[in-house]
Amino acid sequence: MLVVVASLSHIEPRDAGAQSALPLKYTGKPTQPAITADDAMSRVYIFADDSMMGRAAGHIGGIKGTAYIEREVRRLGLVPAGDNGTFFQAVPLFTRTLDTSSRLMADTAALTVVTDYAPIHAGGKPRPLEGLKVIYAGSMTDQSSMASPEQAAGKVVAVSGPTSGVARKYPGAMGFIVFRPDATMGQIRRFATGPATQLRSADDTAAKPLTMYVPVSAAPKFLGVPLENARPGTVGRTLHGEVRYTVVDAPARNVVAILPGSDPVLKNQYVAIGAHNDHLGMRRAGPVDTDSMRAFNRIASQIYIARTHELPDLPGSGLTPEERASIKINVDSLRAIRPLRLDSIYNGADDDGSGTAGVLEIAERFAGAKVKPKRSLLFVWHTGEEDGLYGSEWYTDHPTVSRDSIVAQLNIDMIGRGGASDIPGGGPAYLQLLGSRRLSTELGDLVEAVNKSYPNPFKFDYQFDATGHPEQYYCRSDHYEYARYGIPITFFSTGGHVDYHQVTDEPQYLNYPHLVKVATLVADVAERVANLGHRVVVDKPKPDPKGECVQ
């Protein structure tokens, strides 16, 4: 039996949303086998340091981050399970950058790339636009009145409103135009002109529809009439020209390690435990004052939550112009009395420095145990999650152990927050759970049983696991790449917060006792699964591994 290394009854997390008393920089002591807040803090401060440059997949920061993980698993004595006897599995990513000399015309009028249209390409080779008509299909908010798929076939389909499901509704579209309010185009334009990271695949050269985001003011250039005068089925201009991209290889790497099991037969089966090692890199628009940005986003989120009782899609979004102006006055006052702390690095302390540290803590606990679990433990730190789950997609398509030998996968992504001021309903016992019963009732029951065995158990929040939930969290982290092959999974997360995908996601704002409590739960679940006398029973339908994820 493994030694109990963390008594959950003695873990009393502070509210992670409160003003942090932790330092900007911290150097901890060498880590020990016990899963402790001090060890987790030491790891996150290293992994989410500015020197890691935001850990973007396919960039030097990603190399630095994975090198740190590799040093740790080597020190722990784990077995390499990557390529050619190493801990690394190469993932063939590449970047695709818009060629701003691309030329496109609507009838005889020249269109200005980025200004009139901001193309976002999802992969493959853009379908040719030469000689194609634009058709306005309507708004996805009222699908009953939209143009039919037959009307749209072979044309560039223009829509307004939300875009979810547009590609499924119009499979014969040669391209898509999405109209957006002029005021929202800034971020889209920056994204369109930056390099997009993608995964090499067999259909790299397959023609796929290009999506162009167009400001409402430019709608007449494509439709021939203002957007407010367009009706579903309106056929507009004819496009001429092409949109071109420059492609550059940007290889990245997963880190893969094994703790061999103790049973001579069951050690050939694996319980996978994972997190993602990448984040967003550097802010393309340049440095911002970190403290005033955080102050703005905190106030903005409080206003949005009070109005809607849910988190905004991104911190600072969902406000009226009047609300933004009011907050800016307060933030300008703060900036006037405090020195600027300029920053352009997306440190990703919670996303997913917390998960990476948690998995390392779990690995060190089992590596230091006198009695090992019966089944082997497979630790995978995936790359490319932020760009599209690429590392986990590559690993599950090219596993370094038999895919059928993986009995379950436990995914940890963002486990360092969850306070009352972070998320509605948050607190010391808060934890989101997704997917635990989507393939295996037994796995879901086992997670619940382990949790209930603690003196101070978590209160699991299952709301984001609901079928059809608009956030689609089940489809948005690495666990799904395992689930698509019928491997039972559970996704553990403390959820979103004001620093999500901001340069303010820094180590000093994490709740390390809460992180440790989650990591201990995951370790105990992994141990239970690894010591079962049978494989976790799959009693639910398996998805199509090549199909689209639908929650």
Question: Which residues does each PLM region occupy?
Answer:
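N-terminal hydrophobic or amphipathic helices/low-complexity stretches enriched
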Residues: 17-80, 285, 316-331, 539, ...
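His/Asp/Glu-rich mid-to-C-terminal helical/loop segments that flank catalytic regions of hydrolases
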Residues: 493-551
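Long, well-ordered, tryptophan-enriched scaffold segments
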Residues: 180, 199-254
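Short, solvent-exposed loop/turn and secondary-structure capping segments
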Residues: 58, 102, 147-149, 169-170, ...
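Second-shell loop/turn segments in exported
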Residues: 26-34, 50-60, 90-92, 136-137, ...
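Acidic/histidine-rich catalytic neighborhood of metal-dependent amide-processing enzymes
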Residues: 251-254, 281-284, 294, 299-442
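Noncatalytic luminal/extracellular "stalk/propeptide" segments of secretory-pathway proteins
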Residues: 53-156, 161, 242-247, 251-254, ...
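Metal-dependent peptidase/peptidase-like ectodomains
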Residues: 113, 200, 209-212, 217-221, ...
